[in-house]
Amino acid sequence: MGNLFKHSLSIRSRQTMVDITKIIEEDIIQSGVKDGIVVVYCPHTTAGITINENAAPDVVHDLIYGFEKAYPTEDKNYRHFEGNSHAHMKSSTMGASQTLIISEGKFILGRWQDIYFCEFDGSRNRNFFVKIISG
């Protein structure tokens, strides 16, 4: 499968955001694609992919805090027996993928943007995929 990359992460926190931008940059270089798109995909129902600010670590903290306020980890009204309903809601809100434009061998991101793998039900070993398409 040309230009499909699989990556593994060992997540040791219950809820966290891992910057995966450099990994994706390396995939683009390895692919040799100069113009096209890159899709970053998370195949898990309690994790997601987002693009957000990279300059202030407080942004990551605040995102996790905000998701926890919206979808608390502990809620006696949840019915899902595994106890991770909050993580399913957070990942559904976050989304499972992001698509970016590749131009001149680099993807286009805003000045303060990076790509994050978002874990809401750790600790776990996780995978994500990067698909690079020329054109």
Regions found by a protein language model. Give the residues of each.
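Active-site histidine-anchored catalytic micro-motif
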Residues: M1-G135
